[in-house]
Curated annotation (Swiss-Prot):
NCBIfam families: tig (TIGR00115)
First-listed, main subcellular location of the protein, grouped into a coarse class: cytoplasm
Entry remark concerning the domains of this protein: Consists of 3 domains; the N-terminus binds the ribosome, the middle domain has PPIase activity, while the C-terminus has intrinsic chaperone activity on its own.
Protein's GO biological process: 'de novo' cotranslational protein folding; cell division; chaperone-mediated protein folding; protein transport; protein unfolding
Localization annotation: Cytoplasm
UniProt xrefs under Pfam families: FKBP_C, Trigger_C, Trigger_N
Top EC group: isomerase
Keywords, comma-separated and alphabetical: Cell cycle, Cell division, Chaperone, Cytoplasm, Isomerase, Rotamase
This protein's GO CC annotations: cytoplasm
Coiled-coil region(s): none
Protein name: Trigger factor
GO MF annotations, alphabetized: peptidyl-prolyl cis-trans isomerase activity; protein folding chaperone; ribosome binding
Amino acid sequence: MKISVRNLEPTKAKLTITVDQDEFDPYLEDARKEIAEQITVPGFRKGHVPGKLVDQRVGFGAVAGEAVNKALPDMYAKALDEKDIRPMDQPQIEVVEMPQSAADDTKLKFTATVERRPEFELPNLEGLEIAVDKAEVSDDDVNNRLGTLRQRFATLVGVDRPAQKGDFANIDLTAQTDGETVDSQEGVSYEIGSGTMLDGLDEALEGLSAGEETTFESTLEGGDHEGEKAQVKVKVNSVKAEELPELDDDFAQEASEFDTLDELKAEIRKNIEADAEGRQATIARDAFIETLEEGLDIPLPKGVRNNMVEQQLKSMGVEAGKATSDQKKEAEEAVDKMLKDQMVLDALAEKLDVQVSQSDVFNFLGSIAQQYGMDPNMFIQALMRNGQIGSARREVARSRACSPGCVRWKFTVDGEPLDLSGFLGSEEAEAQAEEDESVAAAAAAAAVADNLTSDDGTDAE
């Protein structure tokens, strides 16, 4: 196989690949065998039709076309590996030449234009040091968390006063346009100030007592008259306020497994400290990545960036063509950081020779599927059909690259070393974690294990 590479941009390359006949012949034979299983030729059993007869029956062009479709991904992957090119998107492939008959010695020749990861050099990981803020927990933090727990055990009691923000009102609603009733609801329970129904409802309800009513103008948000202005009459049937339980030992026993309020507070503080330490580890990880990126002028692949910006805008609930300059800027900044982080972590994973097995990918995807209530088997099959397995593999590698990378870096808090092994993992902890990962997810994914090929780099990021 002959490969030539022309760099169109720092992040874009065009490969011209010429496949030797002895490399292409096996694909022709496989294509003939597959077609032989599908055709009927008198005197021959299915699957046992000679190759020459297959060529005659369906035409060499059909055989060669099937062979080319199977050969291109393999030859492209080999070319990427040989030329050390790391793609960041699906290639644009064009067949330039191919044999037109069994006797034609024309070689298969095709081009592949692809956006690639640019070349850059990571800094030396040894001896790096960074100071991280101390993970502090205040009494206010504990009281706020306790207040949230207390809120969950609140009860609603009727009140004989005008409604105010935070109250729960039982209301009847009637909407009219041009004097005609277009919608009505009765006995609706609504938290005043929540803003979950019509615009203007919160303001209309504040100050009303049970039995009182008022009318306000609003825009209807559903039904046949969605988007129309309407006069909305609201009547208050009852007003209830939240009554919070006393903070005492009885509350601690009702809300937790602890006997006293002091024990409950101690547990809350312990949990908040664990959360703070987790955030501290995340800050350390982000600082590690930022340090790797310092001084690196990494060009971003334009096509990949544009597609990601469009997806980012969609996630913000904005159509790309209708985005304001501020929204577009926000999306572009988020994508630029995301892309740069991905490329740096990919390079780090290669530098550290991070290994990712099929089981690792299965467990990773299985956990995602479970989070979204999906069947892991079906989820993985869908990713395979869309060519995204390689992306998942790289995501696992990026995550794993951070652990050994951060271990080589010294983190300090107030001048004292910070131990992040509990969050970033030691080799022993990672090995144990792998054993403890979801067996169910791996078993569910095993049905597609035979079809999962190694990452050929053609997956879109």
